[in-house]
Amino acid sequence: MSALLNITEPNNNTNTKNDHFLASLTTDATQSTASKYSREQIAQLFDLPLMDLLLQAQTIHRQNFTANEVQISTLLSIKTGNCPEDCGYCSQSGHHRDKTELVAEKRIEVSKVIAAAKRAKATGSSRFCMGAAWKHPSAKDMPYVVELVKEVKALGLETCMTLGMLDTDQAAQLANAGLDYYNHNLDTSRSYYEQVVSTRSYDERLDTIANVRNSGINVCSGNIVGMGESRDDRIDWVHELLKMPKAPESIPVNLLVPIQGTPIGDKVLAEGQLSVLEWIRTIAVTRICCPSSYVRLSAGRESLSDAEQALAFMAGANSFFYGDKLLTTGNASQSGDDRLMRELGLTKQFSAPRLPKQVPVLDAMSGHQSQVILASLS
């Protein structure tokens, strides 16, 4: 067997244009976001040739997680529509209901939520996520959501909720109930945010994330790619994650599903959608910059080909939503997901990931087995 090579070393089969930059990086798998990537370095990652970027991302993924293993979540809307927020992409906003014609639904009975959670567990999900279209939960809503957390956890599932903004007391109540994850997306960059929503500020989103973090609940926070934002906005979003004291434990990288009747959906449908490869680049850069976070495929997956989804997993995604529906939009079918997992050789994760370790990988550019070493950034 050939000796291990560093992929940053020039050889007859590699393009050396990016050698200097690659040599400046490190993938010490024990690092957290304390090794901060600068905004300039994040931009350089986005500019890498796609194959180089995917190789770096997959190597980092294997140093932090078990190869070919994915975490499966199921998402249920426990209260749908009539949301007072004006998010320009969302069919649940009360501001767009005359155009989207979404049928609003009141809170689902606890027994029906538990039945859905049991079905999710039976089909292989390890985490059950519950979402409500609220600006924030009211005082009368808190006993309901606390009961849901306790009942779902009693089934042996991890729990996640997305209920809008939380204050410190609400976060503490959910933490005491045993909530494992709380989702509150940043959606996009600070500079583009005003093009997306006006009823909730960027800082309010960050405040909720801080309240969740301080309560001891794991943070789930991601974005939506393809809302008309620029690559600079995607760079800024990744950089925003690295400004946090600790990166989110779970990062959904959504691909916009343009919904007719929503301002952003109508604009994207008229002007054209973003390349799927740019979404895949965003996944890969997120994996490199947040090596120990779960990177989840969420909205938008239904429309992708098998090959496009395979590239997303190669880019370091290791989690996805399982089931035929997300909150209000369609999702890839369960039978389709089962078939795709078999074809890709992916297995469902039922336990915590292994400890980080150095893993030899096949250098896709030279054909030799090699150990990718990316350097520490300060």
Swiss-Prot record:
Binds 1 [4Fe-4S] cluster. The cluster is coordinated with 3 cysteines and an exchangeable S-adenosyl-L-methionine. It catalyses: (4R,5S)-dethiobiotin + (sulfur carrier)-SH + 2 reduced [2Fe-2S]-[ferredoxin] + 2 S-adenosyl-L-methionine = (sulfur carrier)-H + biotin + 2 5'-deoxyadenosine + 2 L-methionine + 2 oxidized [2Fe-2S]-[ferredoxin]. It comes from the Bacteria. [4Fe-4S] cluster binds at residues 83, 87, 90. Residues 68-292 form the Radical SAM core domain. GO terms for molecular function: 2 iron, 2 sulfur cluster binding; 4 iron, 4 sulfur cluster binding; biotin synthase activity; iron ion binding. Keywords: 2Fe-2S, 4Fe-4S, Biotin biosynthesis, Iron, Iron-sulfur, Metal-binding, S-adenosyl-L-methionine, Transferase. Pathway: Cofactor biosynthesis; biotin biosynthesis; biotin from 7,8-diaminononanoate: step 2/2. Catalyzes the conversion of dethiobiotin (DTB) to biotin by the insertion of a sulfur atom into dethiobiotin via a radical-based mechanism. This is Biotin synthase.
